[in-house]
């Protein structure tokens, strides 16, 4: 699935993305392809499925909120919410969700430094000011 198919499917369910969201989602593919050529972030056999298997899958959380917990979704849209993505790996589901919900503060945490390096680099390249990446084990996080 390429970006255009992703966007069409997204808009069927949600409505239009902003131009900034489109720019960011479109950039995801190239950013992860670049990182994946250096370290194995996503299965190399699955890179062509990044939108279907990683981005849309990540946004399934938002779809669940839309269908089952609309009151929570409204809080996410309004902002002031903090979300912890524990075991984020290279940034899924946190980065796609951060693109979709720019008013939500996302903390992406993983114990593997190279994966957090990828997530941090991708978030920075996308200009996601609502993302913080932390290299730590869950039990070491302050409560």
Where are the regions a protein language model picked out?
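Conserved SAM/SAH cofactor-binding pocket of Class I
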Residues: 59-143
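Class I SAM-dependent transferase core
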Residues: 1-78, 121-131
């Amino acid at each position: 699935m390429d970006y255009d198919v992703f966007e069409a499917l997204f808009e069927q369910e949600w409505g239009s993305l902003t131009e900034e969201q489109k720019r960011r989602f479109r950039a995801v593919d190239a950013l992860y392809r670049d990182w994946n050529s250096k370290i194995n972030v996503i299965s190399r056999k699955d890179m062509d499925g990044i939108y279907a298997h990683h981005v849309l899958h990540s946004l399934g959380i938002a779809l669940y909120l839309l269908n089952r917990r609309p009151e929570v979704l409204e809080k996410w849209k309004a902002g002031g919410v903090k979300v912890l993505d524990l075991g984020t790996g290279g940034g899924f589901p946190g980065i796609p969700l951060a693109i979709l919900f720019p008013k939500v503060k996302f903390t992406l945490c993983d114990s593997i430094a190279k994966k957090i390096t990828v997530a941090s680099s991708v978030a920075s390249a996308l200009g996601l000011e609502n993302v913080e990446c932390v290299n730590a084990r869950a039990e070491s996080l302050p409560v």
